[in-house]
Amino acid sequence: MDNTKEILTLAVEIGDAMLRCGAEIYRVEDSVIRILEAFGLDDFDAYVLSNGIFASANESREDACSVVRYVPLSATHLGKLAALNQLTRDICNHKCSVAEASERLKQCKNIPVYANAVQLLACGIGCAAFTFMFGGHLPEALYAFFVGLIEQ
């Protein structure tokens, strides 16, 4: 297969984006493996850690290639993660080519994050709601709201 490096790089980039969005390590590793299989690679290895991805293909042939990627910790973004999971499903169902998958990956990476004010407010409201849910009253909920703002 002449585009092995392109496929391997795409799979690792999708895994990188998933890790950055807060995906579990086993899910990222499984997704990378499934993507490589979906594009027809059969001689490959992929290993995912909490802050890195190691992948290689065609180790026994002349066109062997490897990709190592450091993935720094970042904030959780479930919207991006859902889009990346859908992209992985579409690749596994053979609904997109390598070029289409690369373009969709760029779109997934450009999904905007919520403004800090919205995130702070949501955290405060969530803390207050849990206070009510566990039997607290208005004074405790107000304290929880402000603690949620501070701790966010």
What are the residue ranges of the model-derived segments?
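Soluble N-terminal domains of membrane-associated systems
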Residues: M1-C96
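A short glycine/serine-rich beta->alpha loop
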Residues: R69-Y70, N110-Y114
